[in-house]
Amino acid sequence: MKAVVIDQKLTYNLLKNLRTKISNILRATSVLAFFCAILILIGCNKHDNPESNPKNSSYNYSIPEEKQDGWPVTSVEDVGVDKVLLEEAISKIVDGDFVNISSILIARDGQLIVDELFRTTLDANDAAVRNTDLNVHTMQSTTKSFASALIGIAIDKGFINSVDVSFYTLFPEYNRFENWSDSKNDITLENVLTMQHGWHYNEWDYPMESDQNTLFFIYSNYSDFVKGLLDLPMSSEPGNSFAYATMASHALGAAISGKSNKSVPDFAQEYLFGPLQFDTVYWLFSPTNRAMTGCCLFISGRDMTKFGQLYLDKGRWNGEQIISSKWIEKSVTKAVDLNFGFTDGYGYQWWMKEFTVDGQSIEAFFAAGNGGQFIYVFPSLNVVIS
C-alpha cells in the first residue's frame, strides 16, 4: 500500500480531470452499457455453432492467469458463457470499435473468467502516484463506493453509531462554521451517503474554473476541503434533493479517521483491502493530509472486480464476512429516484440501473468514475464486470 501526498497544482489538475459532467458519464456508459448487454446475451443464449471461430476475429480467449490473490479462475465455458460470442465482443475493443477501454474483467459464479488488459501506456494520473504498472488504474469517482464500504465497516466495528448520526457531530475539531443555519444540525450521515445533504452544491453544471462550480470554489478558497464543505450555505432541507458532491465523499473519509483514530489508508488496509488481498494500492492526499475518498484511489482491475464480488456476495469474501450483509443491502437499495439516462437511482454512493435485453429486465448496481471506471454487478446473473 502506498500513499502519495501531492502539491496544490497537481491536486487542481486531478480535480479538474475528476469533474464529472453527466454528458461525460453518458458517453462512457453508452459503450459499457452496450458491452454489458452483449455479455448479458452471452450469459443467456448459446451460439448456434460453439465450435466455430468468429470471422476475422482479432481476439482469442484464454483463461485468466492464476495468481495468489484469492481469485479462483476458470474458463468461460465452465460457467455457461459462450466463448465464440465473447470473442466477438472483445474483438470490437481490440479492433478499436470501442475506444478508451483500458481493461475488461468478468467474474461469474464467484470465479474470474476474463482478465484482459488493453492499455499500453501510462498517463498523467499514473505519474501523480508514480505508478509503473499498467494493471493499476485511477478509480476516479468509483472511489466513492469504497468510501461507503469503509463507513459501513466503521459502523459495524462501532466507531460510528449509525447512519442516523448528525453529520456535523462527526467533526468536533471545528468550533465554528460559516453560513450557519439550524438545518445543518439535521444533516445525517445517511443524507451525505445518498447525496441528499442539502448544501448549496453544484459541480456538474459549471466549468471547473468557475466559482459557481462548488468543487473549484472549495479548492480555491480552502486548504481544508472538509471545512470548505461544512461552511457551505444550505439550499434545501436535508433528504429532499439530490446534489452530487465529491467533497461530501471526501468528508466521509475524514469522519472515519476522526472516529477511529486511524488514517484512511491504514483503516482500509486493516479492514477491507487486507482481507480482500489487494495487491497494489495508492491514495492521493489533500493539502491537510487526508486521503481523498471522493476521487483518488488507484488499484488493479482484479481488485476492482473483487470489490464488486464482495457486494454480490453480501459482504463475504472467501468465507469471511468483511462487511455486514445489512450494510450491503442498504447500500445498493435505491434511496433516490433519478432519470439521468445512465442511471435510474442512487443508494449509499452506489448507482442503480435496470437494463432491458430481449424483453428481459435485468437489474444492476454499479460504481462509476469519470473516464469510464466502472464496477457493474448483476445479481440475477451472478456476474461482475469491471
Q: Can you describe what each PLM-predicted range is?
A:
Residues 157-199, 231-234, 260-295, 299:
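Active-site helix/loop module of the DD-peptidase/beta-lactamase fold
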Residues 202-285, 294:
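A small/polar active-site loop signature that marks catalytic segments
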Residues 30-40:
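Bacterial N-terminal signal peptides
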Residues 110, 133-163, 192, 252-256, ...:
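Active-site SXXK
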Residues 248-255, 295-317, 373-386:
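Active-site-proximal alpha-helical segments within enzyme catalytic domains
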Residues 42-127, 155-161, 194, 223, ...:
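N-terminal leader/targeting segments and the immediately adjacent pre-domain N-terminus
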Residues 1-26:
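N-terminal secretory signal peptides that target proteins for export/translocation
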Residues 278, 332-384:
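Active-site Gly/Thr loop motif
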